[in-house]
Amino acid sequence: MRRNMKEHVAIGPFIPYATLLAGLTLITVAPITAQQPATPKGTGQSERDSNRSAIVCEPSLLGSPYIPVDSWVYPAVLRLYSLAYVDQVYLGMRPWTRASLRHMLEDIDAEIEDANTYGDSSVGEAQDIYAALIHFLRYDAGMKCLTNQGNSHVESVYTVSRGISGTPLRDSFHLGSTVINNYGRPYESGFNNYSGMSGYATAGRFVLYVRGEFEAAPSATRYSQGLAQALSTVDGTTFLNAATNFPYNQATIPMGPIGTTTDGRFLEAFVSGRVINHEISFGQQDDWLGPGLGGGMAYSNNAENIYSFRINRVEPLQVPLLSRLTGPFRYEFLIGSLRGHIFMPNPANPSGTNPNLPNVINPGDPWVHLEKISFRPTKNLEFGFERTAIWGGKGHGPITIHTFLKSFFSFASPGGNGKNGRDDPGARFGAFDFSYRLPFVRNWLTLYSDSEVHDDVSPIDAPERASWRPGIYLSHVPGIPKLDIRVEAATTDPSRSNGASQYGRFMYYEAIQKQGYTNQGQLFGDWIGREDKGGQAWITYHLSGNEWLEAGVRNQKATTFFIPGGTTLNDINFQVVKRIGKDFEINSNFAYEHWKAPIYPTGIPTYPAGQQTVTTTTIQFTWFPERKISF
């Protein structure tokens, strides 16, 4: 029996918890030297102790953990921004550190706390959000710059139970996904569970962060051999391995049967150091590049986090003269390895000597690097540029400084052996995004858009070839201040603007890097897919700053040029988030989905296509512990 996920129950599930405990213990007992402020002569011990909490640390010298991108903090801050209370928010670059969030709120505390609710119904909403965020940051207020001082904290302990009926989709590279933006977690029809914890330790400029969980999902039939072969043809990959005469185990095509999953893994696990307002980090870590709530064209949490090295300017930078034009700006650089890309040699050109043929059908496990810069020329406008390159991998040139620089500085499509050989500079994508609080309705409406293009420098340069995710957000409804509305559209279908389909072989795809923009089989960009259109909408009633009732809809439709017969997916979902006290959260979600694809299940389009109905019921319990350990 073929299994895409190895079934085991022994020591694996306990690895994240053991590592978290060991890491927090290690950094707790390790002495870290930091600058100790001078104490005037004659000062008593009690006075020294009372002064400790008043010491203001230099922010550029203190490490601070990132806030996970699936935290409630982000939609809360996005709403506070759209209510026109915070200005220095970089919507297109997430995650933020806890210290960065604290700095965003420092300038508005007096304004919010002293605001008069008379005549402005949104003031009460802003005050609720501010109070919830201040409670979230309560542990950070006592951080000190003293010898052997630090902070170790269990951030959250949680369990997620998910029941699915029907046949769910888990194929963002082709037919679509029932559950999106979920770190590539496994799920199948039946009972699924994810239970874990997160925690961090800080010491001076250094941070250790770990988020691990135990995952369990049922076995499944998944795709038939005929459907898997048809999708392999769509991708331009080889279905059968000539050396073994068995199908390639392609992570992007979930061919069944698939065994039960019982495993432990890290969602995030990284170490970082603070250097002059930069967080330099290594490990598995979150990223979300784009202002949208439902997806990020360049990067999201739709797939498992990659192992990467990152340099992130976490605080805005002001450059004399330049910032008069661009305003303050932030930037980020990331490089890491992708997994789940299977090596396929090209039997027609095994030696790679024919410049007219690629030397491989698909390289194995390439690397990716990306660069992003975002500007805020005014308090109401943000815009950013991003570039991604996927290069190297088994069968191509090794990952070296030389091959990295070649991919970094290559902007034109190479011809002949430059593309087909080992020295291919890689698959290159460019992104652009912006957000703008509209004039005359600054605290009501925020317009934003995310976009990405393949084989062009920027979507601005080639809008007709670009993919787009525009959105608009109404921060509160007139007469109902607790209600907000958000709508986002999404398309990766270039034929809508230039009349020419790319048959699914353009966005998130590349002629050489055929498994393209994926990690462990799932797109790490926007869940909308390779040649699809659709969108999302949400209407949310806020009970408090971190509690709400929400109804949403989602649509996704692949073109018939991409998937034979096309696909259609529609769902309606409801969410309730409620706190018991301030530190125990119940998050429940119900989704009702219809999807159909004529190519399913045989691989041969059949009409009329059978409609699949899927219901997903999820409940999550999360405890945010009160206590921390200081050292």
Regions found by a protein language model. Give the residues of each.
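Signature for the C-terminal beta-barrel architecture of outer-membrane proteins
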Residues: 287-288, 308-517, 530-537, 542, ...
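Carboxylate/His-rich catalytic cores and anion/metal-binding grooves
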Residues: 198-245, 263, 378-380
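Short loop/turn motifs that connect adjacent beta-strands in outer-membrane beta-barrel proteins
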Residues: 66, 89-94, 113-128, 201-205, ...
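Outer-membrane beta-barrel "beta-signal"
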Residues: 373, 515, 611-631
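Sequence/structural signature of outer-membrane beta-barrel proteins
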Residues: 178-183, 217-219, 253-254, 278, ...
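Extracellular loop and loop/strand-boundary signature of outer-membrane beta-barrel proteins
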Residues: 182-184, 253-257, 294-299, 345-359, ...
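N-terminal periplasmic/intermembrane-space "pro-region" immediately following the signal or transit peptide
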Residues: 32-190, 196-204, 631
